[in-house]
């Protein structure tokens, strides 16, 4: 089945998608650096590079898609807002598994300060899923993916199921409004692309989540 993976650190079976550079510490085997995602995207136009922004807010090869990771880099929401103000960024990806460094309101603050940019909030906050679904509901420039969260909290796979999180995923996927801004993300190689894909194919919104929503978002930032 054709699908795009909007949150992967390596290539598996996706027809294309966003490849996220991983820089800084700790280093993880089988993940791609900024230099590697740049090289892949130049050779294969099915993949778009998301360049990792470090705490020094240094230059990256292309500012169109940027990835911020507050938990690893310890920058504040105000610092990210300031950095985005002089970047030619069209799509901003901000890791949401950041307790205790950021709270959900910090993400809302960054989104509100950048109405001209699109955002992907990957992992949809983990334990804080309800707050991030609220951000999704009230901000038309926000997309989410459930990478990591979908498997870690037992929505798919064999781990124990945490109802508030798994039910939140189901609620979002069954919402005609919200499901239009959900992207498939796996977080490979940390979590299974295959397990998640199998579960998504059972939902009425599968074609949108696996293909259409991604294609529409990419068209908006071209």
Where are these regions (language model features)?
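Mid-to-C-terminal alpha-helical segments outside catalytic/metal-binding sites
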Residues: 1-6, 171, 176-181, 191-222
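Conserved, mostly hydrophobic/aromatic
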Residues: 7, 37-41, 123, 144, ...
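Active-site beta-loop-alpha junctions enriched in small/polar residues
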Residues: 9, 22-25, 52-56, 69-71, ...
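Short, well-ordered alpha-helical microsegments
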Residues: 11, 34, 57-58, 103-104, ...
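Active-site gating/metal-coordination segments in enzymes
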Residues: 31-101, 140
């Amino acid at each position: 089945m054709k699908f795009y993976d909007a949150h992967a650190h390596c290539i598996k079976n996706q027809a294309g998608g966003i490849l996220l550079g991983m820089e800084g510490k700790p280093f993880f085997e089988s993940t791609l650096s900024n230099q590697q995602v740049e090289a892949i995207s130049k050779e294969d136009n099915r993949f778009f590079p998301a360049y990792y922004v470090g705490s020094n807010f240094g230059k990256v090869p292309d500012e169109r898609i940027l990835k911020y990771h507050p938990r690893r880099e310890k920058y504040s929401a105000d610092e990210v807002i300031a950095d985005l103000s002089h970047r030619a960024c069209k799509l901003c990806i901000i890791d949401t598994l950041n307790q205790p460094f950021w709270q959900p309101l910090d993400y809302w603050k960054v989104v509100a300060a950048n109405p001209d940019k699109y955002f992907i909030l990957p992992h949809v906050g983990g334990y804080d899923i309800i707050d991030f679904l609220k951000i999704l509901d009230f901000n038309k420039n926000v997309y989410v993916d459930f990478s990591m969260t979908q498997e870690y909290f037992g929505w798919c796979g064999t781990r124990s199921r945490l109802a508030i999180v798994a039910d939140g995923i189901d609620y979002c996927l069954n919402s005609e409004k919200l499901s239009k801004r959900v992207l498939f993300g796996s977080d490979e190689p940390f979590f299974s692309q295959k397990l998640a894909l199998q579960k998504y194919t059972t939902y009425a919104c599968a074609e949108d989540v696996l293909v259409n929503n991604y294609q529409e978002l990419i068209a908006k930032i071209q």
